[in-house]
Regions:
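Catalytic-core elements of nucleic-acid end-processing and repair enzymes
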Residues: 1-257
Length: 257
């Protein structure tokens, strides 16, 4: 098998590498603008994370005795019922619904579209390297047997498309039993040698800072924009904002080669 570089420099080269992780086989992708950021859901990051109480075998985690972030979700859910008549009945689907509307939860967004992940990795922070992660989930949420409040480990969650963004972004979520326990990727130093997708769960590919502007423009040229990923007025407006930030960063780079 031919070796592949760990760094993504151009769109054609990125596609060549990311095709090694077919979404039809279940691979998911996530792009982050800063390669140093951990793979943590928002509920596990400062200032939103609150340490859970020590485990009490007499009172295990439950809806009535939830971890701090799920207690916050319970409170949100009670109040949200007064604002919306379409709250999902399922605990898992409602958690995704809450995340969609900005609540810090123990869900981390992923996508089945590698180019969407690449877009998010190159969208900003042009002065630092970004990263695209490829993840093969070994476990999926079974709504008939899984309990949100006592869940441990990590598992993939698929939800009904309650918003057009879910469809446009080919969205999926990874649920964390402990929101402060980051996923840890395989680190490849020089080359991805003898890659065997069936044995690797999580792969990290770095995008050097100078390459982000190039890849961002190439993605726009093939129709991957904020408007396509966020098909609403907010996405349209943010597309104009992104373009302005891109031009500013591009001009700054030309002045300081």
């Amino acid at each position: 098998m031919q070796p592949y570089p760990t760094q993504l420099i151009t769109l054609p080269q990125a596609i060549e590498i990311l095709l090694r992780f077919p979404q039809k086989l279940g691979w998911l992708f996530r792009g982050q603008e800063d390669s140093s950021w951990e793979l943590l859901p928002k509920a596990g990051r400062k200032p939103f994370y609150r340490h859970a109480r020590p485990v009490d075998e007499q009172r295990p985690a439950s809806r009535r005795n939830p971890p701090p972030d799920l207690g916050r979700f319970n409170h949100w859910r009670e109040l949200a019922a007064g604002y919306s008549s379409t709250l999902p009945a399922s605990d898992f689907d409602c958690l995704a619904y809450a995340q969609h509307y900005g609540l810090p939860t123990r869900l981390l967004d992923w996508t089945a579209n590698a180019l969407a992940a690449l877009f998010f990795a190159c969208e900003g922070h042009f002065d630092v390297a970004g990263a695209v992660y490829a993840y093969f989930p070994r476990r999926y949420i079974d709504r008939d047997t899984c309990d949100l409040y006592s869940f441990s480990g990590n598992a993939c969650l698929r939800v009904p498309p309650f918003d057009r963004r879910i469809l446009a972004q080919h969205a999926a979520f990874v649920l964390f039993g402990d929101p402060a326990q980051a996923l840890s990727p395989s680190q490849f130093e020089d080359e991805l040698k003898e890659m065997n997708c069936g044995e690797m769960d999580l792969i990290k590919c770095v995008i050097p800072a100078p390459a982000k502007l190039i890849i961002h423009r190439q993605l726009e040229d093939v129709g991957m924009t904020r408007r396509t990923l966020f098909p609403d007025l907010d996405g349209l407006s943010r597309d104009f904002v992104t373009e302005a930030l891109y031009l500013e960063a591009f001009n700054a780079r030309d002045k300081n080669p």
